[in-house]
Amino acid sequence: MKQTLLQEKYPVYVAEIDKAETSCQSVDEIVGYLKQKIAGNPKVQFIGVFDHYAHTKRIEGEINPEIKAAVDVIFCFGLALPNPQVLAVRPRSIGVADMGSKFVVSFMEAPMKPANEAMEAWAKGLRDKR
């Protein structure tokens, strides 16, 4: 998993996972895996899945031809509400893109260490075949 800055300002974690490295062979299978991880943590609430590929196609937006499918799994760690401004950085999402021979799993860094650790562990857990 690597950390990078998207557009030179958004801290993003990215994992590129070859399909030979994971037992998940579709975006839907990765979504199922992530939903299990979310359900297994009592401090996390699943919200939904946004099919970004279908949305972009429907509005006739531009899609990189290498992307075969792309979704965001949306959830919230919301352990506390110390102030109303914290709502600006919630909920969280993990993006999953099928690039043909590999998946790209990405998420923006959260302002809360336990959330980052959990999301990183979930992404790394997809590499279950070596």
Residue ranges of model-derived segments:
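Short, surface-exposed beta-strand/loop "edge" segments at domain boundaries and coil↔beta transitions
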Residues: 25, 81-85, 112-118
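Beta-strand/loop substructures that line and gate deep hydrophobic ligand-binding cavities in soluble
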Residues: 93-109
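Ser/Thr-rich, low-complexity intrinsically disordered terminal regions
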Residues: 32-84
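Short, flexible, solvent-exposed loop/turn segments with mixed acidic/basic and small polar residues
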Residues: 3-8, 63-64, 93-97
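C-terminal partner/receptor-binding element of secreted or periplasmic proteins
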Residues: 110-130
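Generic recognition of long tandem-repeat/solenoid scaffolds
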Residues: 15, 72-74, 105
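Short, surface-exposed coil-to-beta transition loops
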Residues: 88-92
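Terminal, regulation- and interaction-focused segments at domain boundaries
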Residues: 1-42, 51
